[in-house]
């Protein structure tokens, strides 16, 4: 028997090697040609607690997580108790025979017989690979790649245990539907959202990253640090978030594209720096990886509750742009786009992601980085004209920008209001001119807004509107809700500010019912659309329990 779409859930304690097992399975599945989506749920502790690593795998493109489980790999007894109700009909539980699990549809594995406790994840890798019908040499190569240059004796021990697990499972009679083989596997990468943001920033020419560690944004900085020496990049862990944002502004003033990854609580400390970037007209990209608040909240869970925080952060009024990628691929491209907009319009730009997208991995086609040029840094090369006016009044609001120490001109920037030369002023007429100059940049930003993406039936009976990481779940829910008598469409915003009503209002007005799907309490995008257009959505599907929005959740909330 074969099944073309199934979900694996690995459960256990932190420290049991769940992530290693999950990553090895994910890479083996991708090398075999399958499409995957990996999601992780973990508690805020180093060891213990209950963590899960889920892989949805299919012969078709996977765009969303699924709630039901086909194969539950229980690394401890608690996992069976907590998740057996999620196992679908025809599903299977793989458990350690030493746990004394007594439940239907359970394959009891003699882990102690097949390998020592510390090799339990390798035993599970072998057993699960056989159950799925994966090519065993391919799985062995994935393990070899992971082990790399580790101790030869230890690597050989892992290989022996994997082979033993293969042989044991081959001898079992188990009623479980295997995956059909993929005829022509194509080359793809396993990459999560944060890795894609880091790669997109590198491709754009980012040269400075300052950060203070905060889940779920930290791995952006860690991925950049891993490439720092090769790419000529400085990554600085600051003493706090206030220092991090100001370091990035200083680096950008000196001429290098700069990025600051953080989360809601850390970003709250950065808001004065955001205002400084707005007044000094200094480019900076701030990545806000959302998690549930207020305060510490649920630091390892997901939410979409910081749109309004980012939209209004920083005292005073100044232009900004806010991007909200919905896929791993969009994380890459919008990281590039964000740095480009920041440089072109000289100010703060935000990339809003969340724990679900940050930590979720997908099989993606490799990005053609070799043919991508770094972004234009927006710095004037010809500095021969005199006098130099950093804040010259221009029709676009964008003024000439030179780097300090690179020409004979004095380069000045500061947080006080200023005339065209950048020095302090309290002339109120100048104040009016400068506010108008800065705000004129909004027109240029609006001219380059990424339009929301409409998919589905024109003039739909039901239109699902969303932003950010909920994109895949909304698309899959729409496909399930669509039938011969019901037209369904979706509208996804990958840029949530500024809004350009002409790009999307027609879709809203032509739909029978408009439902906004968001991971927050109030429906922040719905409120923003109402504020900017006067259009009120008819219903809202909202989730704020720390779990990602799923297609099943949307359908349940709609009552379908």
Regions found by a protein language model. Give the residues of each.
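Active-site cofactor/cluster-binding pocket
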Residues: 1-204, 208-210
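Short beta-strand segments
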Residues: 74, 94-96, 262, 285-289, ...
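Gly-rich Lys/Arg/Thr-decorated short loops/hinges at beta-loop-alpha junctions or inter-strand turns
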Residues: 147, 171-186, 201-206, 224-231, ...
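Flexible, low-complexity linker and terminal segments
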Residues: 190-198, 202, 334, 339-560
């Amino acid at each position: 028997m074969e099944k073309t779409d199934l979900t694996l859930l690995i459960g256990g304690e932190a420290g049991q090697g769940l992530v290693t097992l999950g990553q090895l399975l994910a890479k083996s599945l991708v090398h075999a040609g399958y499409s995957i989506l990996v999601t992780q749920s973990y508690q805020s502790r180093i060891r213990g607690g209950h963590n899960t690593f889920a892989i949805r795998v299919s012969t078709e493109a996977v765009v969303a997580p699924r709630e039901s489980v086909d194969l539950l790999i229980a690394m401890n007894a608690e996992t069976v108790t907590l998740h057996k109700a999620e196992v679908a009909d025809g599903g299977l539980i793989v458990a350690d025979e030493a746990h004394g699990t007594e439940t239907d549809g359970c394959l009891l594995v003699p882990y102690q017989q097949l390998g020592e406790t510390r090799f339990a994840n390798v035993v599970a890798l072998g057993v699960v690979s056989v159950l799925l019908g994966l090519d065993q040499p391919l799985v062995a190569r994935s393990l070899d790649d992971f082990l790399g240059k580790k101790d030869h004796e230890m690597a050989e021990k892992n290989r022996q245990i994997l082979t033993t697990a293969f042989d044991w499972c081959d001898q079992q009679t188990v009623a479980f539907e295997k995956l059909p083989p993929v005829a022509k596997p194509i080359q793809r990468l396993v990459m999560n959202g944060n890795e894609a943001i880091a790669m997109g920033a590198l491709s754009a020419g980012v040269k400075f990253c300052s950060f203070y560690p905060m889940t779920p944004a930290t791995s952006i900085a860690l991925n950049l640090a891993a490439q720092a020496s090769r790419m000529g990049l400085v990554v600085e862990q600051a003493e706090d978030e206030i220092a991090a944002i100001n370091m990035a502004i200083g680096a950008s003033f000196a001429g290098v594209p700069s990025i600051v990854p953080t989360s809601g609580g850390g970003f709250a400390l950065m808001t004065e720096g955001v205002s400084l970037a707005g007044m000094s007209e200094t480019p900076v990209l701030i990545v806000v990886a959302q998690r549930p608040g207020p305060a510490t909240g649920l630091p390892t869970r997901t939410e979409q509750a910081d749109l309004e925080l980012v939209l209004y952060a920083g005292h005073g009024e100044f232009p900004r742009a806010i991007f909200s990628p919905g896929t791993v691929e969009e994380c890459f491209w919008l990281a590039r786009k964000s740095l480009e907009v920041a440089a072109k319009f000289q100010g703060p730009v935000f990339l809003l992601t969340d724990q679900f997208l940050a930590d979720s991995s997908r099989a993606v086609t490799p990005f053609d980085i070799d043919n991508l040029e770094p972004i234009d840094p927006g710095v004037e090369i010809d500095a021969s004209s005199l006098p130099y006016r950093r804040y010259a009044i221009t029709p676009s609001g964008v003024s000439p920008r030179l780097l300090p120490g690179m020409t004979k001109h004095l380069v000045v920037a500061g947080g006080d209001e200023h005339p065209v030369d950048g020095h302090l002023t309290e002339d109120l007429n100048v104040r009016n001119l400068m506010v108008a100059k800065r705000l004129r940049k909004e027109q240029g930003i609006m001219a380059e807004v990424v339009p929301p993406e409409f998919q589905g039936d024109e003039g739909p009976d039901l239109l699902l509107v969303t932003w950010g990481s909920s994109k895949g779940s909304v698309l899959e829910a729409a496909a399930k809700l669509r039938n011969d008598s019901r037209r369904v469409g979706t509208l996804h915003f990958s840029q949530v500010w500024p809004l350009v009503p002409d790009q999307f209002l027609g879709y809203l007005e032509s739909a029978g019912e408009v439902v906004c799907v968001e991971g927050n309490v109030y429906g922040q995008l719905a409120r923003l659309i109402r504020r900017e257009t006067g259009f009120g959505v008819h219903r809202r599907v909202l989730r704020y329990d720390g779990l990602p929005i799923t297609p099943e959740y949307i359908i349940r909330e709609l009552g379908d």
